[in-house]
Each structure stands twice: as structure tokens, then as C-alpha cells.
Amino acid sequence: EGSNKQYHTQLEENGVGDYVILTGDPKRVKDIASYLDDAYFVADNREYVTYSGYINGVLCSVVSTGIGGASTAIAMEELIQLGCHTFLRVGTCGGMRLDVQGGDIVIASGAIRQEGTTREYAPIEFPAVPNFEVLSAQVESANKLNLPYHVGVIQSKDSFFGQHAPETMPVYQELQNKWDAYCRLDCLASEMESST
């Protein structure tokens, strides 16, 4: 009580930049922050670890979110309360097309909202799509760095094992049918946060 800190992230306005890189694993934050100029530790609470630093003189932050949409939404809501406005999700995913190889960059032009969190924010018919300028900047960067990349729709889900071992689930046939449909629709990859 009386603190200006956000409840879950323990962040204050002067500790974070307007631009935020989000990653699931708290152990990745320091490594990612090492690419920032003058990076420094800001906070560590629950699954939320934060470092800040500079890119071309602009304050930016790296924040872990834990796994899934719900914990990602908590981080984003608190960061938005502090004035953050641009988020870039960096993490792992599972390729759904044979041409998406390990180590390739997947740039999401949209996400299938097969999770429960975003239903609290928008009707399911509303698509989860990124800001066009941010999407374009990602493609431009991948080209500039000559990295193998793919741009397209991805799947965001709540259950890691439900898609990777659907036969172990009571709703096996439903999960398998959806997976097969997404593959036929040329979905690039599957993960758990980007639709948030």
C-alpha cells in the first residue's frame, strides 16, 4: 500500500522503456538484455524478471512473462499502465510445416486464438494481428541480417501437451481435427503467448 509499483511485476514508470521485448523464460532475460547498451537489472517477482537498457539511445526493456496467455496478459496490462506501447514477443515455438526448420525465425502475421485469455478482451471473431509497422520492421530486420524466416499465421494455445501428445487427452479427436485443419490452412507454428 502506498507504493507506485505494479503488483505482479513490481515495476515503476521510471524503470521501463516504451518498447518491451517479452520472453517466457526468466532465465533468458539477462541474455537478451546483454544486447542492449548499458543494460541493468530492474525487478524480479514471481515469473516476471525485468532488465532495461538502450537501443540507439532509446530506453527499452526485456520482461519475462512465464508460460501462457494469462501470465503474459498480466505483464502486458501492468506494462501498459506504465506507458509501454510496443511489445515484441521472443521465444520458442513448434513448427507445423515441414519447411519451418529448427532455428528459423517465425514472424507472426496473425495468431489463431485457441486459448482462453483473449476471450476476456475481445470477441473470438476479432483476429489477433500485430501492428503493421512492427511486423514490417521484423521482416526488414530478418532480411538485413540474412536470417531464414517465415511470415504467416501461428497457433496460440493453452495446453502444451494437448497438441504434442493429443492421444493422451480425453478430447483427442477434437484436438487432432483442429491440428489437421490448421496444418491444411498453412499455419506456420504453434506456441502459447502471441495471441495475447
Where are these regions (language model features)?
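Active-site rim beta-loop-alpha module in soluble metabolic enzymes
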Residues: 129-186
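Short, well-ordered coil/turn segments that N-cap beta-strands
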Residues: 18, 58, 147-148, 188
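Short Gly/Pro-enriched turn/cap motifs at secondary-structure boundaries
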Residues: 43, 189-190
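Metabolite-binding pocket within alpha/beta catalytic cores that recognizes anionic/polar moieties
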Residues: 1-136
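Short glycine-rich, acidic/polar surface loops and turns
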Residues: 191-196
